[in-house]
From Swiss-Prot:
This is Trans-aconitate 2-methyltransferase. It is an enzyme of class 2 (transferase). It comes from Escherichia coli (strain 55989 / EAEC). Belongs to the methyltransferase superfamily. Tam family. GO terms for cellular component: cytoplasm. The gene is tam. InterPro entries: Methyltransf_25, SAM-dependent_MTases_sf, Trans-aconitate_MeTrfase, Trans_acon_MeTrfase_C. Its EC number is 2.1.1.144. Catalyzes the S-adenosylmethionine monomethyl esterification of trans-aconitate. It catalyses: trans-aconitate + S-adenosyl-L-methionine = (E)-3-(methoxycarbonyl)pent-2-enedioate + S-adenosyl-L-homocysteine. Pfam families: Methyltransf_25 (PF13649).
């Protein structure tokens, strides 16, 4: 599991794209020229940006070679760069920085977010969506299984919180619109939940394990999911998935 798997990620493409659609709908910009899609993945969010602003110069940034290759194949009219978001520098100031489900993987948001604001033109917008599920059973159980099986903590940090992000971005000279939404995804089985998180949140926990260790981890994880997520009357499972949204417009 040395690289991200675009096919596995796109298995739940509709569910993963819905927050991007809803974030984009709140971006208060019309005619813009320079756009960056940070953590563009296989290009599903970049495609939405390209549809809204077909004349804009859109650059997708991702650290995964596999994701960049998939995005280039899907969107030949857009530019894609393999780079670390923290180190990438645009050639010109940006009108929009769009980051759908990517910045949660990076540390030091107290430094990262002001840095991203500094890359914007005056009146430019930083639009961010981040999964806020660190305390959801899906992610709590990852940590519990790792502790049971004596594996080191590989999970990402929790988010800073709504009030912290408001202060960070206000102090960086932005007008801030911030909200939190919980989606309830209908899942056909507990294995489907594992398939979902294996492409993203579970990946760091598994990537350094031998195949036999991965199977032990996943077997125990499946057992614990069954305890935490009961079946509905129709046999479906409702997977709660909170997400934090931020639209910050630079005013300084």
């Amino acid at each position: 599991m040395s690289d991200w798997n675009p096919s596995l990620y796109l298995h739940f493409a509709a569910e993963r794209s819905r927050p991007a659609v809803e974030l984009l709908a709140r971006v208060p910009l019309e005619n813009i020229e320079y756009v960056a899609d940070l953590g563009c993945g296989p290009g599903n969010s970049t495609a939405l940006l390209n549809q809204r602003w077909p004349a804009a110069r859109i650059t997708g940034i991702d650290s995964s070679p596999a994701m960049i290759a998939e995005a280039r194949s899907a969107l030949p009219d857009c530019q894609f760069v393999e780079a670390d978001i923290r180190n990438w520098q645009p050639e010109q100031a940006l009108d929009l920085i769009f980051a759908n489900a990517s910045l949660q993987w990076l540390p030091d948001h107290y430094e990262l977010f002001p840095h991203l604001v500094s890359l914007l033109n005056p009146q430019g917008v930083l639009a961010v969506q981040m999964p806020d599920n660190w305390l959801e059973p899906t992610h709590v159980l990852m940590r519990e299984v790792a502790w049971e099986q004596n594996y080191p903590d590989r999970g990402r940090e929790s988010l800073a919180g709504i009030h912290a992000y408001y202060d960070i971005l206000s102090e960086a000279g932005c007008e801030v619109d911030i909200w939190r939404t919980t989606y309830y995804h209908q899942m056909p089985s507990h294995q489907a939940i594992i398939d979902w998180v294996t492409a993203t949140g579970l990946r760091p926990w598994l990537q350094d394990l031998a195949e036999s260790e991965q199977q032990l981890f996943l077997t125990r994880y499946h057992q614990m999911l069954e305890e935490q997520y009961p079946l509905q009357e129709n046999g479906q499972i409702l997977l709660a998935f909170p997400r934090l949204f931020i639209v910050a417009r630079r005013t300084e």
